[in-house]
Structure formats: C-alpha cells, structure tokens
A protein has these predicted regions:
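Terminal connector regions
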Residues: 112-141
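Short beta-strand elements
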Residues: 132-151, 158, 417-431
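DG-centered beta-turn motif at the end of beta-strands
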Residues: 1-20, 214
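Beta-strand-rich binding/interaction modules
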Residues: 61-98, 105-110, 118-124, 161, ...
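Acidic, S/T/G-rich, low-cysteine, solvent-exposed domains in lumenal/extracellular/periplasmic regions
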Residues: 17-35, 155-349, 381, 394, ...
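Membrane-embedded catalytic interface detector for glycan/lipid assembly enzymes
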Residues: 270, 308-314, 319-326, 331-493, ...
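Short beta-strand segments of immunoglobulin-like
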Residues: 50-58, 350-355
Length: 504
C-alpha cells in the first residue's frame, strides 16, 4: 500500500518466540512496517529433543540403553504422555510420562534383540492436538565384528594377538608400520601401536587426523623407543609422551575405579588387590590436557596408563612396553578386561540423527564414486543426490536445501547401502510461546506499528492504521438524530403556540 508516497508493509503472523533474532529489524527509508499479531491458542505440546545410546559399540543380541530427552514446551503439566520405541518396525519399548510445565526430563530405555546390520529406529509420542513433532528418528549400525588395527615394527605382539583372539567379536588385523593403507584408517574404531622403535612423520600426521575425526589410539612404547618421534606424535594430540627410561622395581599403587574403563568390571573390588609389578618404565610428561584420566598409577600418583581426550577421539598411553622385561602387565588379570573396555568404548559411528535446515556436513566412511556411480539418499521412492567431497579417510555429503522431509534415508551406491541416515525437524518449532506486544515493539524500528488482533476485522484494523479513526458515519447519524429532534421540537412548539393564541 502507498500513503502519500510512502510504502506500507504488513506482516501477519502469530510471532512465535523462536522466530525472533537478537537484533532489531531495520526498515528501508520511507517504508512503514505494520506487524499484525494473530491471537493464537495456548496448546499443550511435548516433544523428544534428542537421544543418545550409552554404548559406543553395538553387538548383536546385547542389551542397549537409550537416553531420551523429553521437553514439555507448554505452560501446564503434561499428564501420562504415551511413548513407543520402534526398531526396524518392531516395538521394543512402551511407556508413559508426566512432565512438569516448561520442564526437561531424561529417561533411559533398555531394549535388546538386535541383529547385525543397520537399525532404523523411531520414537513415537501420542500428544494431541500438536502432532507435527510426535516422531523422532535415529539410526545406528550393529556390527557383526569390530575391526582393530595393530601396527608394529614387523613382528606381531603375542600378547595383543592373544587378547583379541579371546573374543570372536574382535577382528584384529596386524600390519607393519611400513605397509599401512592410510586411506582405510578411519574404518578402524581402535588402532594399537606397539613395539615401534620410531614413528615416522607421515604416520604421526595420519594418526593425528584419525584421532581428531573420532578414532581411538592406544600407544605402547617399544623396548628401545625413539623418544623424539613419540613426542612428535603425542604432544600435538595433547597427550603425555615418554620422556626417559627408569630402571628399578616398583608396583602399580592404585587404579581409578571412577574411570569408564573399569565400569562393570568388578562386582566387589578387594581392599588389597593384586596389581601389576613393574621392573622398568618410561616417565610420562605432564600434560596440560584437563580432560585426562589415569587408568592406573604408580606411587606418588605418577601415570602408568592414562587416557586423554583429543579432538573428537581418545588417546591412551602406557608407561611400559608390552614385554615382561618391563612389567607383568601383559600377563596380569587386569590386562584383558581393560583392553576389551578400551576397545568397546572406542566406537566413533556416525551421529544417530541430523537436523533439517542446520546445514550440517554428513561424514561417512570413504566411498569411491565416479560419474556413473553417484551416491543417492533414498526414501520411499524419493531420490536425492547430495554434493559429495572426498577427504582423506572419509566422504563428506552436503545437503544444502535438497532435503525437505524428515525420516530415515538409505545412502546408496547403486544397489548397495553405504549407510542409513536419520533426519528430524528443528525442535525450535515445537516451542509454541509467542512474543508479547512489548517484545515485538523492541524488535521493530520506530517507523513500525504493532497491531494486536482482537474482535475487529483485519480490514478495519488496516484502515484505522492508514487513515485514522473514521468518524464520518457517526457524524451523519448524529446529524440525522439532531435533525429529527429539531423537527420534533419545532412541531411541538408551533402546535403549543396555536393553542395559546385561541380566544376564550
């Protein structure tokens, strides 16, 4: 609309709070903005915001624990909201929840009976009348076997071979340090270095990339370690590195039972446990990494076996070589369960879900493609071709605005399924709270007007905003009323005079 040359812009909305930015709206010079706020009903709404699986590695037939984050976006308590978990179309859990107004509640759901392969999972709520956010999708892979890469100087370590041969779930592959396929490193959740006298610059750089992307690296120094090369590997990863070799009998003085590695290992820990005996060891440097945790320590709480968070991954460093000349650790009863726990904590699968519109980069294991073999996201007849970028150790997918519908998609290369990926809506839409008139006024420039809808029609509101309050109809009505009164008065007084003037 135009009013004396000025442009008028009308924005009609209920103005949910999630639409508001942190900065005020700027209007063009000569443009008048009118915000017409529709009156919205207050509706109850509960949604699943996110989920997380407690196990990093998923094994066939084993129990899984899923942490669910439930959010009540309404201003009143939600009573007994039914929730159902489906995995590959089969119901795995059922429950109901009462959540206080505007509250967040966490719950852990236990389920089992999974077969090897990709799992397509859905959480469903019954929460009427707002239903657009009643489904939450996620996916994960149950491995038939877990690959482990053992890198050494050319001679396999018998203790490591014995550990991973004890459980057929682990598929350990031995490779000498001069024959490593760097492109495949990202396919191994766990890489173990042992008996390497020196670590090459190229290997150190590749392992740094591997850890930053979420891999787990376990380092056992050799009998005669080149300490400079070990420092070049570990220092950039914010992990301790071996500094010097000390010879002398000592013993591990304690273990950190609070460390995740020892979770569920002991039913009842003895007061005087049998701990590894040490004949010689490397002193480990102090690390500035505040996310480090001792697994075992020597007298004076000197680190013996320690873990560090680095990038998206983990680094574990031992102060001894896997050799009985150093300690009896390789034959100790603690060695196998600790190694298993490190392996099972090492999973770095893809995220359980992605969010539509978040412009996230989707990272999958390396997939070789050519113009005739394109990667496609497929769901119930829909086929979307993402932009693909190859990086060392991974394939990156960029969706931009190609994807518009939530659900679970198969990432396919021709007829083979490379991965299964879940997408959900941004849960900011679930918050059905609205801006007040004062909050709207603070967001718009001085040249703007906030119009709150009421019983009046939108047409009358716009007319009043443009031309002011129109009184001409009222004036005409009042004029007619006054005219009628005047006519009545004239007739009354005229009749009265005639009656008075008549002779007696």
């Amino acid at each position: 609309m135009h009013k004396e040359g000025a442009r008028s812009l009308y924005v009609i909305s209920d103005f949910q709070k999630n639409m508001a930015g942190s900065q005020s709206v700027k209007a063009d010079t000569g443009q008048h903005i009118s915000l017409v706020q529709l009156k919205a009903s207050t509706l109850p709404n509960v949604a699943v915001d996110s989920v997380a699986l407690l196990s990093a590695i998923h094994r066939p037939g084993e129990s899984e624990k899923l942490v669910v984050r439930l959010h009540n976006y309404a201003g009143e308590t939600a009573e007994k909201i039914p929730l159902k978990l489906l995995v590959n179309g089969a119901q795995k859990a059922l429950g109901s929840y009462t959540i206080k107004a505007r509250a967040v509640q966490y719950d852990t759901i236990t389920f089992s009976g999974l077969q090897a392969g990709w799992q397509r999972a859905e959480i469903s709520l019954q929460d009427n009348p707002v239903t657009f956010d009643n489904q939450f999708y996620f996916s994960f892979n149950v491995r038939q076997q877990m690959p482990v890469l053992l890198i050494d100087g050319g001679t396999p370590n018998p203790y490591l071979n014995a550990v991973f041969a004890a459980d057929p779930f682990f598929n350990a592959r031995h490779v000498p340090d001069g024959n490593i396929d760097y492109a495949s490193l990202n396919t191994y959740p766990l890489i173990v270095l042992s008996d390497l006298n020196a670590i090459s610059t190229g290997l150190a750089q590749q392992l740094k990339t591997y850890v930053n992307k979420g891999g787990t690296l376990l380092v056992f120094p050799s009998n005669d370690a080149d300490l400079t090369s070990y420092r070049a590997l570990l220092e950039p990863l914010n992990a301790a590195y071996p500094e010097k070799l000390l010879i002398g009998d000592t013993k591990v003085s304690g273990i950190n039972l609070q460390n995740q590695v020892f979770k569920n290992i002991f039913e009842d820990f003895p007061q005087n446990p049998d701990l590894p005996v040490v004949k010689k060891y490397y002193t480990l440097s102090s690390s500035s990494n505040n996310r480090s945790e001792n697994i075992m320590f020597l007298p004076g709480r000197l680190p013996f076996w320690t873990g560090y968070s680095s990038g998206r991954g983990k680094v574990y460093v031992s102060a001894v070589a896997l050799d009985e000349d150093f300690s009896n650790l390789p034959r100790h009863a603690l060695f196998l369960p600790v190694m298993f726990r490190i392996a099972l904590l090492s999973g770095h699968d893809q995220p359980l879900f992605y969010t539509l519109g978040a412009d996230e980069t989707i990272e999958v294991p390396p997939v070789q493609t050519n113009p005739k073999q394109l990667l496609k996201l497929v769901k119930q007849g829909q086929s979307i071709i993402p932009e693909v970028k190859q990086e060392e150790g991974s394939t990156l997918l960029y969706m931009a605005d190609r994807l518009q519908e939530t659900g679970i998609y198969d990432l396919k290369k021709q007829d083979s399924t490379v991965a299964v990926i879940a997408f959900n809506d941004n849960r900011s839409e679930s918050d059905l709270s609205y801006l007040s008139g004062s909050e709207l006024s603070a967001l718009v420039p001085r040249a703007a007007t906030v119009l709150a809808s009421g019983k009046a029609s939108l047409k009358s509101m716009v007319t009043e905003s443009n031309f002011g309050l129109q009184l001409w109809k009222l004036c005409i009505i009042l004029a007619l009323i006054f005219l009628g009164v005047e006519i009545a008065l004239i007739r009354f007084f005229k009749t009265d005079r005639q009656q008075v003037s008549q002779p007696v």
